[in-house]
């Protein structure tokens, strides 16, 4: 890993929950250029926060913190399975016409406190904005036009078409992970490398 770098804390989404919806998304979208940035279902996750690291020591520090907080985090979730739905779309960017990210929106949002405990220990990048849990569908950094990455794209057609679309129902969130930024693998079947994770529910 090169330094400085970024890691991220996330709730991974198992690909079987969302792969059929993403196949439909690809088949029914009408913009080949935009869809060139599609990375596949294996990258699906809910981002909680970004973790800057300058060296191996920083990486070990954030991994140890996650492991040390395992009991506290698991206790806060209780003994029931943690499930969410993904419905509709939204964007990050200056405007819908200048979107950098198109994402599916989780119906249940209850993880702001996770961002707080990591921020309090100076592990996250400073960000005063409230947590926006999201599952990225398209990101401008992966979309190319005439061999060059685009800066933004028009998300309006996607939000009109998939604004009420149910991407996945009863997704079980079973672990919390620290991952490397920068998906790897073949186009359409990319994934993020996991550095550390803790289970959110212990099976008897």
Swiss-Prot record:
Cell location: Cytoplasm; Nucleus
Pfam entry (one): AKAP7_NLS
Q: What is its main location?
A: cytoplasm
Cytoplasm keyword on record? yes
Top-rank taxon: Eukaryota
GO annotation, cellular component aspect:
cytoplasm; cytosol; nucleus
Task: List the InterPro entries.
Answer: AKAP7-like_phosphoesterase, ASCC1
| GO BP term (any one) | DNA alkylation repair
Leader sequence range is none
Listed A to Z, the keywords are: Cytoplasm, Nucleus
Stated name of the protein: Uncharacterized protein C15D4.13c
Source organism of the structure: Schizosaccharomyces pombe (strain 972 / ATCC 24843)
